[in-house]
Amino acid sequence: SSMSIIKVQEYLKEDGSSPYQEWFNSLDVQAAAKVTVAKSRLELGNTSNVKWFDGIGEYKIDWGPGYRIYLAQDGKQLIVLFGGGTKKNQQSDINRAKELYQEYKRRKKEISKEQATDNDNRDKR
Protein backbone atom coordinates (compact mmCIF):
# COMPACT_ATOMS: atom_id res chain seq x y z
CA SER A 1 0.00 0.00 0.00
CA SER A 2 1.07 3.60 -0.45
CA MET A 3 0.83 4.39 3.24
CA SER A 4 3.81 3.21 5.22
CA ILE A 5 3.65 2.32 8.86
CA ILE A 6 5.11 5.08 10.99
CA LYS A 7 6.44 4.60 14.47
CA VAL A 8 4.70 6.96 16.88
CA GLN A 9 6.37 7.43 20.21
CA GLU A 10 5.98 9.77 23.16
CA TYR A 11 8.79 12.12 24.04
CA LEU A 12 10.27 11.21 27.41
CA LYS A 13 11.99 13.94 29.38
CA GLU A 14 15.30 13.34 31.11
CA ASP A 15 13.48 12.37 34.31
CA GLY A 16 11.58 9.71 32.34
CA SER A 17 8.23 11.50 32.45
CA SER A 18 6.05 11.82 29.35
CA PRO A 19 4.29 15.17 28.87
CA TYR A 20 2.00 13.46 26.36
CA GLN A 21 1.04 10.70 28.78
CA GLU A 22 0.38 13.23 31.55
CA TRP A 23 -1.99 15.11 29.25
CA PHE A 24 -3.62 11.90 28.01
CA ASN A 25 -4.22 10.69 31.56
CA SER A 26 -6.12 13.90 32.32
CA LEU A 27 -8.69 13.29 29.55
CA ASP A 28 -12.13 11.82 30.12
CA VAL A 29 -12.98 8.46 28.56
CA GLN A 30 -14.58 9.85 25.40
CA ALA A 31 -11.78 12.30 24.69
CA ALA A 32 -9.17 9.61 25.35
CA ALA A 33 -10.91 7.36 22.82
CA LYS A 34 -10.84 10.12 20.17
CA VAL A 35 -7.17 10.78 20.84
CA THR A 36 -6.36 7.07 20.63
CA VAL A 37 -8.02 6.89 17.20
CA ALA A 38 -6.05 9.95 16.07
CA LYS A 39 -2.82 8.34 17.24
CA SER A 40 -3.55 5.15 15.32
CA ARG A 41 -4.21 7.21 12.18
CA LEU A 42 -0.78 8.77 12.56
CA GLU A 43 0.69 5.28 12.80
CA LEU A 44 -0.88 4.53 9.42
CA GLY A 45 0.88 7.55 7.96
CA ASN A 46 -2.26 9.66 7.79
CA THR A 47 -1.01 13.19 8.49
CA SER A 48 -3.60 15.06 6.43
CA ASN A 49 -5.09 16.50 9.65
CA VAL A 50 -1.75 17.95 10.70
CA LYS A 51 -0.91 21.64 10.39
CA TRP A 52 2.73 22.60 10.75
CA PHE A 53 4.22 25.54 12.70
CA ASP A 54 8.03 25.84 12.73
CA GLY A 55 8.55 22.09 12.71
CA ILE A 56 5.76 21.36 15.18
CA GLY A 57 2.75 19.46 13.90
CA GLU A 58 -0.68 20.12 15.30
CA TYR A 59 -3.11 17.25 14.77
CA LYS A 60 -6.60 18.67 15.03
CA ILE A 61 -9.48 16.55 16.30
CA ASP A 62 -12.80 18.11 15.26
CA TRP A 63 -14.74 17.10 18.32
CA GLY A 64 -15.66 18.56 21.69
CA PRO A 65 -13.48 21.51 22.69
CA GLY A 66 -11.23 20.97 19.67
CA TYR A 67 -8.52 18.69 20.94
CA ARG A 68 -5.03 18.97 19.48
CA ILE A 69 -2.07 16.63 19.57
CA TYR A 70 1.36 18.24 19.25
CA LEU A 71 4.06 16.29 17.50
CA ALA A 72 7.13 16.44 15.32
CA GLN A 73 8.22 14.23 12.48
CA ASP A 74 11.75 12.87 12.68
CA GLY A 75 12.60 11.53 9.25
CA LYS A 76 10.01 9.53 7.33
CA GLN A 77 9.43 6.74 9.81
CA LEU A 78 9.07 8.40 13.20
CA ILE A 79 6.59 10.76 14.81
CA VAL A 80 7.30 12.08 18.30
CA LEU A 81 4.39 13.16 20.51
CA PHE A 82 4.96 16.11 22.84
CA GLY A 83 1.52 16.58 24.32
CA GLY A 84 -1.90 17.88 23.58
CA GLY A 85 -4.51 20.40 24.53
CA THR A 86 -7.61 22.19 23.37
CA LYS A 87 -8.16 25.14 21.06
CA LYS A 88 -8.40 27.44 24.09
CA ASN A 89 -4.75 26.98 25.13
CA GLN A 90 -3.44 26.54 21.62
CA GLN A 91 -0.68 29.13 21.68
CA SER A 92 0.84 28.11 25.00
CA ASP A 93 0.57 24.43 24.00
CA ILE A 94 2.42 25.12 20.74
CA ASN A 95 5.13 27.04 22.61
CA ARG A 96 5.55 24.19 25.07
CA ALA A 97 5.77 21.66 22.24
CA LYS A 98 8.43 23.80 20.55
CA GLU A 99 10.50 23.84 23.74
CA LEU A 100 10.21 20.07 24.10
CA TYR A 101 11.13 19.63 20.42
CA GLN A 102 14.30 21.70 20.88
CA GLU A 103 15.14 19.58 23.92
CA TYR A 104 14.46 16.41 21.91
CA LYS A 105 16.80 17.50 19.10
CA ARG A 106 19.53 18.56 21.51
CA ARG A 107 19.40 15.30 23.44
CA LYS A 108 19.25 13.26 20.24
CA LYS A 109 22.57 14.81 19.18
CA GLU A 110 24.12 13.94 22.53
CA ILE A 111 22.74 10.40 22.38
CA SER A 112 24.03 9.77 18.87
CA LYS A 113 27.51 10.75 20.06
CA GLU A 114 27.22 8.29 22.95
CA GLN A 115 25.83 5.56 20.71
CA ALA A 116 28.76 5.83 18.35
CA THR A 117 31.04 4.74 21.20
CA ASP A 118 28.47 2.39 22.72
CA ASN A 119 27.55 0.32 19.66
CA ASP A 120 29.88 -2.60 20.39
CA ASN A 121 28.45 -3.06 23.88
CA ARG A 122 24.86 -2.88 22.70
CA ASP A 123 25.12 -5.97 20.48
CA LYS A 124 26.13 -8.09 23.44
CA ARG A 125 23.25 -6.97 25.69
Where are these regions (language model features)?
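Basic, Lys/Arg-enriched alpha-helical interface segments
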Residues: 1-66, 75-79, 86-125
